[in-house]
Structure formats: structure tokens, C-alpha cells
């Protein structure tokens, strides 16, 4: 059973950009040390992001990376795979929310180096507790194991929010009990962001 922290999924549209041009754009973006996630967090997107992280780490270790996030969230395990790899590399990571960072997307926005969590003015951030997907089946003992694992996952997410915001466990527990939506400014005041920005120059000067 997959553990997820996500908004409802939407259909993916095929890119209208010709493949050769899309490849050139992708290479130019990666060469500028920018990594994007613009869809759900799953095993596919996690694998792609991790490969890019290690490519940048191996080619120029220690040089800053900008991680741009516009995501409705997704699978917890896939999100933590990205989180752990970002913490392992030597390159400092800046996160920039543009559009939406919901659920696991909001967790990923917190993986930045200290003082490097940014968002654009019209971005939104949503936090909540992890969701179960699919039909729950099995023996009573199996369901008990799943429930315990879910609780451990929930507490782990709460601890990340606690460390990121400076709020206590009970305050975060209350905030994620239901979907909590925030504007960029509200997320800044809550402690999920370091700055709301209007230009890339503000990132470079911080």
C-alpha cells in the first residue's frame, strides 16, 4: 500500500514543444544548475531528480543548485528519497516555490540550505497529514502494522515541520489535522519560507 501526501492527481498533457527543442531547453536548464519538479512526486519524478542532483554534484561539487517546485505532492517514500539525496550532496540547495507546493511538495520546499527557502508572491502552500491510497485489505494484525507505519510517517513529517518552523509538535499536529492552505506571505509568517521574492536577483543577493 502506497503512502501518499498528495492532492488529487490530474492528467498529464503531452508537451507542445518539439522533442529536439525540448532537449535543448532541458540541457540549458540543467547546465544552469536548475532542477524542476512540476508534477506529482512519484518514483519516476524522484528518479529523474536524483539523477540530475548527482550529475550536478559529480560535475561541479559544492556549487549551488536551484530546486524549483510546483507540485501537488505525492508518494512519501519518493519524496523522502529526494530529500535524503539533497542532504547527502555537498552542493547547497535553494528551493523556490512557484505556483503550488502542496503536501509532499511542501516538505520538499523545506530541504533547502539554511535561509534558502523562497517562493514567488502568488504561490500557495498546503500542509496536511499523509493519506492512504487504495483499498485497505488484510488480516487484523496486518492492518495494525499498517496503522503503526502510518503513524510513524505522520510523526516524521511533523518533526520536519517542527524543525523548519520552530513551532512545537502540538501546534504542527493541529495545523496538519486538515488541509491547511497558505499564501506565500502566510507561509512566510508560519515559518515555512525565508523570503517571498519577485526576481532571481533576490535569490542571488541573499
UniProtKB/Swiss-Prot annotation:
Record localization: Cytoplasm
UniProt keyword annotations, A-Z: Cytoplasm, Hydrolase, Protease, Serine protease
Pfam families linked: CLP_protease
Keyword Cytoplasm tagged: yes
EC number: 3.4.21.92
Catalytic activity field: Hydrolysis of proteins to small peptides in the presence of ATP and magnesium. alpha-casein is the usual test substrate. In the absence of ATP, only oligopeptides shorter than five residues are hydrolyzed (such as succinyl-Leu-Tyr-|-NHMec, and Leu-Tyr-Leu-|-Tyr-Trp, in which cleavage of the -Tyr-|-Leu- and -Tyr-|-Trp bonds also occurs)
One function term, GO molecular function aspect: ATP-dependent peptidase activity
Active-site positions on this chain: 103 (nucleophile), 128
Residues in the signal sequence: none
PROSITE patterns in the cross-refs: CLP_PROTEASE_HIS (PS00382)
Quaternary structure annotation from Swiss-Prot or TrEMBL: Fourteen ClpP subunits assemble into 2 heptameric rings which stack back to back to give a disk-like structure with a central cavity, resembling the structure of eukaryotic proteasomes.
Family, as annotated: Belongs to the peptidase S14 family.
Protein name according to UniProt: ATP-dependent Clp protease proteolytic subunit 1
